C-alpha cells in the first residue's frame, strides 16, 4: 500500500482535490493518505473532508492526521507539499510593495518581486522538509504545490 503524505494539509482546496484525484487511480485507491499541518483545527477539517471522500468513493484507503511532520514522513512513498509560510496577511506586502514601484502582481504569485518575497519565507521550511525526507523516506518523491 502506498503512503502519500500531505504537508500543509490544512490548505483545504489543494488537499481535497488532490486526494480525490489520487484515489481514482486503481493503483492508489488503497493508499494511506497521511495529513500533516501545524494548525490542528484546519488539519481536523481536512481529515474529515478526506474521510468523507474515502467513504463516498468506497475506497479502501486509510486517512491519518497529525501535527508531527517527522512522524508522518516515515516510510512515505510520495510527499505533496502545500505550505504557506507566514500568514495570509503577508500577501498584502507581496502585492503592495511592488505596486508602489509600478509592478502589478497576482495574489499568490511565484514570479517577480512577490515570488522572491515568498521564496525567502518558504525556502528555510522547504529545506527542513527535504532534510527530514532524506532521513525518513529517502526514496519518496516530492510534489511541491506551494
Feature locations, PLM:
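Metallocofactor- and cofactor-centric catalytic cores in central/energy metabolism, strongly enriched
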Residues: 1-95, 108-146
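Active-site gating loops and adjacent loop-to-helix segments of metal-dependent hydrolytic enzymes
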Residues: 101
Amino acid at each position: 500500500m502506498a503512503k502519500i503524505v500531505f504537508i500543509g494539509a490544512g490548505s483545504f482546496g489543494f488537499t481535497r482535490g488532490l486526494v480525490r484525484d489520487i484515489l481514482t487511480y486503481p493503483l492508489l485507491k488503497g493508499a494511506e493518505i497521511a495529513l500533516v499541518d501545524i494548525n490542528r483545527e484546519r488539519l481536523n477539517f481536512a481529515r474529515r473532508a478526506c474521510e468523507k471522500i474515502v467513504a463516498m468513493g468506497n475506497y479502501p484507503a486509510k486517512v491519518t492526521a497529525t501535527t508531527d511532520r517527522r512522524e508522518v514522513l516515515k516510510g512515505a512513498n510520495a510527499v505533496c507539499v502545500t505550505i504557506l509560510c507566514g500568514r495570509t496577511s503577508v500577501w498584502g506586502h507581496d502585492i503592495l510593495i511592488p505596486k508602489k514601484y509600478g509592478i502589478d502582481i497576482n495574489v499568490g504569485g511565484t514570479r517577480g518581486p512577490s515570488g522572491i518575497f515568498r521564496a525567502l519565507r518558504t525556502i528555510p521550511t522547504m529545506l527542513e522538509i527535504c532534510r527530514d525526507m532524506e532521513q525518513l523516506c529517502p526514496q519518496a518523491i516530492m510534489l511541491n504545490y506551494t
